[in-house]
Design a protein with these regions (language model features):
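N-terminal assembly/interaction segments in proteins that build large macromolecular machines
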Residues: 2-278
Length: 278
């Protein structure tokens, strides 16, 4: 049997990030063959990940990737078991790598990387979801990760002129839009983007609430309720967090100030755990 040295174990740990005893056992099992030991560890990692795959992953982070030209942003929700691991540097690096990989290819197969990281960190890790937004015209992708990386936001904002994107009012607008989405949690960009079945259900609820009113008054009351509903769930209809006017009116005011057209085209908001069932 080949003698396993401390130097070999240290080198294998550096290459794989696996634990000391795991590296020693891998080298022993493969008689000092480093490549075979790496493969042995990968197989062990996969087995370890399988054992841990049923553990609850209620913690985690939202990771962000923005391309160098600022034209494509990607959000990823990655869940783990404990907040301690969510704050771990190795886990954070892993999350950033996953976000970059999904930016390149939204359908990327990252299972091997996930199982290897499960073995290294010692907790169940799940790549829960990812989404990207991009622009192929003048404008910018606004991004924001809230403190603790529990909420992440993307928004695409189009302009008529490229030079608008370099102005301070526009940059401030991007920041304000992401803060609005973070704080107010809109469900849709505008009225056209709302789920029409859900909208009709809101109308039915309102009609039931006021069924004892005169018939001619019911529809006016219902439409008033729906207008209020729009102001709560549609981003452009929401009250802007920094003023009394709506988000739509605030964007229009900035556009007028800059002599350009500015339009919010789409947004994504991820919050850790919001897709998990109780």
């Amino acid at each position: 049997m080949a003698e396993i040295t401390v130097a070999q174990i240290g080198k294998l740990r550096q290459q794989t990030g696996a634990g000391l005893m795991d590296c020693k056992k891998a080298l022993t099992e493969t008689e000092g063959d480093v490549e075979a030991a790496i493969e042995w560890l990968r197989k062990k990692g996969a087995a370890t990940a399988e054992k841990k795959s049923t553990r609850t992953t209620s913690e985690g982070v939202i990771a962000l990737n923005l391309t160098g030209d600022g034209k494509k942003g990607t959000l990823v929700e990655i869940n783990c078991e404990t907040d301690f691991v969510a704050k771990n540097d190795k886990f954070q690096d892993f999350c950033n790598e996953i976000a970059a990989a999904y930016s390149e290819n939204a359908e990327a197969d990252l299972e091997e990387k996930r199982t290897t990281t499960v073995a290294e960190i010692g907790e169940n890790i799940q790549l829960t979801r990812n989404a990207s937004l991009s622009l192929d015209c003048p404008g910018a992708v606004a991004t924001y990760i809230h403190h603790g990386a529990k909420v992440g936001v993307l928004a695409t904002v189009e302009t008529g002129k490229n030079e608008t994107t370099q102005t301070e009012p526009f940059k401030q607008l991007l920041n304000d839009i992401t803060l609005q989405i973070t704080a107010a949690s809109p469900e849709a960009l505008d009225r056209d983007a709302l789920d029409q079945d859900k909208l009709e259900k809101e109308r039915e609820i309102a009609r039931e609430q006021f069924k004892d009113k005169p018939a001619q008054a019911i529809e006016k009351i219902v439409e008033g309720k729906i207008e209020k509903y729009y102001s709560e769930v549609c981003l452009v209809d929401q009250d802007f967090v920094k003023s009394e006017r709506s988000v739509k009116d605030h964007v229009a005011a900035v556009a007028k100030e800059l002599g350009d057209e500015i339009t919010i085209k789409a947004f994504v908001r991820f919050q850790v755990g919001e897709t998990q069932e109780d």
